[in-house]
Amino acid sequence: MARFLKLLGTYFYYITLMVKSQCLSLLGRYGIIIDMRFSQTFIKTLREAPKDEIAKNGALLTRAGYIHKELAGVYDYLPLGLRVLEKIKAIIREELNKIGGQEVMLTALQNPELWEKTGRFSDQQVDIWFKTEVTGGGELGLAPTHEEPITNLMKTYISSYKDLPVSVYQIQTKFRNEKRAKSGILRGREFIMKDMYSFHATEEDLNRYYSEVEKAYARIYERLGLTDTYETFASGGIFSKYSHEYPTLLPVGEDTVYYNADKSLVFNKEVYNDEVLAEFGAKKSDFSEDTAAEVGNIFKLKFKYSEPLGLQFSDAENRLQTVYMGCYGIGVSRVMGVIAEKFADDKGLVWPEEVAPFKYYLVGIGAEGSKKAEELYAGNEDVVFFDDRDVRPGEKFADSELMGMPVRIVVSDKTLAEDAAEVTFRKTGESKLVKLSELAID
């Protein structure tokens, strides 16, 4: 009987290991890395940033092992950086799904014939294309945006007023041959963007949905920790009188914004003039000037693309009408760079909890401290980055500050003498001893 129970226990032990392995595999497949021991990663931190990386966000993210620079404006995302990106994407997805957004993935390879219908394949009109010759003849471009392709796609699926409204979005890599690509991941030649497009039967319905997106964007930036991101009046170009941008106040930003005392009115430089201010009952003496980095924008496109590309629907009286459109963008990789740049201090990165790759940075010191740290790590792999390297404690502490995870937990022979762990908060630097019985890792 004893032998049987022992065999049964061994069986369940291996079943548990198999289930855990499968769970890790599934989670890893979707880009969520949950078993992260420093000793088992290829990540290495750097004391100094590469000489050609002058932007603070790029320098810190490189030093901390989040990204790797290939060339100007082109970066690889390493495991920790990818995890930050996935958390940003998850927040965006959740809020857009709430307002009826449906996720798609369009090809990056673009047919010139489609773009020539709007005049936007010409280098004189759009000078940021990456273009290439196709084997066998012809030309292709790498998409800098997707207004034309999504409009053309919807011609297959929108034919009646009953098919409207509809909203689709994607989160994918864009390519722009930028002349200035020297701001880390704030401005790249290859970058990750969320672009959403909505389609409507009437202008009233476009306005209704536009308002829903405004509210969703406010929730997104709040959750990302970018609480001083303000909806800003900008030029609507040929689409409408105004569009809206979402700049985050940032000393190294490329934009200039003007805001009143309670920031209920914010204008970009392009529309900041007496005529516009008079429309809002304001005057220049009410406003302050600051620099900012744009992390999103929204436009009422109306018929800008649906008309030349022939996107129409039959209304209730069976008359052909042109579809109204809106477009809504968020620079996902730029958001990551802005967060890195904005919250960093002289020791390194400081991630808001919602986007941090891991909430906790765990350190074990000494034989007993390391053993206890292993126990704390077990079962908490999804929220804990475990620095189990055989290096000096000071090196671990410096790397924890450089990498910027919100909470550091240190278990040492010394803290165990008090049956406690030392908990340090990255944002404030506050440290305290917490009894192990009261230490909640969640």
Ranges and model annotations:
Residues 2, 20-23, 30:
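Intrinsically disordered, low-complexity segments enriched in serine/proline and basic residues
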Residues 5, 12-13, 24:
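Short hydrophobic targeting helices and cationic amphipathic motifs
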Residues 9, 28-31:
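Residue-identity detector for glycine
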Residues 14-15, 31:
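Short terminal hydrophobic/aromatic SLiMs and anchors at protein ends
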Residues 30-442:
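NTP/phosphate- and nucleic-acid-binding module
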